[in-house]
Amino acid sequence: MSADPKVLLTDLIKTALKSVAPEHADTAILLERPKQASHGDFATNVALQLAKPLKRNPRELAALLLAELPASNLVAKTEVAGAGFINFTLAAAAKTAVVGEVLAKGADFGRGAKKNVKVQVEFVSANPTGPLHVGHGRGAAYGASLSDVLCFAGYDVTREYYVNDAGRQMDILALSTWLRYLALFGIDVPFPPNAYQGDYVIDMARGLRDAHQGRYAGVTLAQVLEGTPGLPVAERKDDEAKQQRELHLDGLIANAKRLLGEDYPFVHGFALNEQLGDGRDDLQEFGVHFDKWFSEKSLFDTGLVERAVAELEKRGHIYVQDGAKWFRSTDFGDEKDRVVQRENGLYTYFASDIAYHLNKYERGFDRIIDIWGADHHGYIPRVKGAIAALGLPPEKLEVALVQFAVLYRDGQKTSMSTRSGEFVTLRELRREVGNDACRFFYVLRKSDQHLDFDLDLAKSQSNENPVYYIQYAHARVCSVLNQWGGEPAELQAADLGKLENERELALCARLAGFPEVVQGAAADYAPHQIAFYLKDLAADFHSWYNAERMLVDDEAVKLARLALAAAVRSVLRGGLAVLGVSAPESM
């Protein structure tokens, strides 16, 4: 028998329905906890649901259902309330049974049955052109926690990072590294303001020099600048000046490719691998892992980009204008049509994105979840439109948006960037407040809500700090169990009937709700629901701990209370693990 009272009550109600209205025996039963404790432990509106199709008064129908409800010693009281609700008050044994179930199942309590549903979650996928910043951190924490929640709920999950290793941004990184490298050999090319500025580029240049000396420095300043339009004065911010800077950058990239020749792919690969490796290490330290790192370049190498565009063309969704190929995305709800292949023959980023999603569908996932920054909201219609245009079901793709996190210190909004103009990095944040606080605070709100990240609160060792408060509850249980020093088997044999007071029964009810919270968090893509649950569970435990002694003289009462405490510890540890947070045994 399940210790979940909802399962028990649902079975009882369905049995009654088979007698009263067999044609409606498969009706979904909704059970909720009443807001007022005086209304019992659970209430259902099934009589209100069926009153109209059965042409019966809902209160009369509720009374009929109660008359046919099988007797159960786990239900203490039933009543018809209000317009036709049925309230249930559970017997103490039904409430405390969850303790034994938690102790028996351990880390598997709350784990959902295998659903045979393949889910792909793609997240972070930051351009490997610089260190991960605090914005990437929220996407990483959310994506990792969501993946773990889905996995715990019973889904077959693949965690994926899309590596943007093709295209202009990587060329700009390679150029930036090479120009800084040349400067180490006295070749001082004026550094473009639209190249990558961070100190990490200088560090990469030094690494390139240390590994290969002056192998890539056999050029002159004139050769590097040959044919470029030059840079406008820094004060100019007009569109013409911006365009000139972009043309100058493109000219430098073309010259780098020509002058380096066969060595250009190596410099390009060196810069990519340095940044990608740094990002991997950063995420690994953050407890964020991926099953697959998917290369954008592979889409071109395998011809999938060309095949995807050709398929759209074959289906009549492509037209040519001014030498470029355009996708008719306005036919699918987008605000304007989009270029997929430029007049120079190069494919756009959107084209590779179409190919990547085609690849996801061809890999046979039942559900595809993309986690994007909230600023990419407008990108959704064109991607879903392309999927539909390829003859694939766009509803299989779901996009979860992540808002940026804002840092606060001393109650004041703090700068999100350093002197060099770079965003505060994820590594800097982790080093200041710790991994646990980062992982927990990042998922304290719905992903599409703005997040105010209070640095002082995240570092504080107080009850106001939610992660500290939860971890402290876990450590408190560990301390009590260590003082006791007995064997786990003694707790599994405890007489749970000794759990009688209001706080103990409330804790049992909270524990029993964990499996439902897991399924809800998975269904809503909302790991914050587990964070909220853990805060409530910790609050219930601290309240009980402060009011009652665990190690009392009465052996039966002591074992029952220790069993309840051990069950709380198990669920706290399991819930924190799903969120990527540790559960220390002492604090």
Curated annotation (Swiss-Prot):
Catalytic reaction annotation: tRNA(Arg) + L-arginine + ATP = L-arginyl-tRNA(Arg) + AMP + diphosphate
Keywords: Aminoacyl-tRNA synthetase, ATP-binding, Cytoplasm, Ligase, Nucleotide-binding, Protein biosynthesis
GO CC terms of this entry: cytoplasm
MF GO annotations: arginine-tRNA ligase activity; ATP binding
EC number: 6.1.1.19
BP terms from Gene Ontology: arginyl-tRNA aminoacylation
UniProt-annotated location(s): Cytoplasm
Domain of life where this protein originates: Bacteria
Keyword Heme applies: no
InterPro entries according to UniProt: aa-tRNA-synth_I_CS (IPR001412), Arg-tRNA-ligase (IPR001278), Arg-tRNA-synth_N (IPR005148), Arg-tRNA-synth_N_sf (IPR036695), ArgRS_core (IPR035684), DALR_anticod-bd (IPR008909), Rossmann-like_a/b/a_fold (IPR014729), tRNAsynth_Ia_anticodon-bd (IPR009080)
SUPFAM superfamilies: Anticodon-binding domain of a subclass of class I aminoacyl-tRNA synthetases, Arginyl-tRNA synthetase (ArgRS), N-terminal 'additional' domain, Nucleotidylyl transferase
Motif ('HIGH' region): 126-136
Keyword Nucleotide-binding: yes
One Pfam family hit: tRNA-synt_1d
SMART domains per record: Arg_tRNA_synt_N (SM01016), DALR_1 (SM00836)
HAMAP family: Arg_tRNA_synth
Subunit-level organization: Monomer.
Family label: Belongs to the class-I aminoacyl-tRNA synthetase family.
Record-given protein name: Arginine--tRNA ligase
Gene name for this UniProt entry: argS
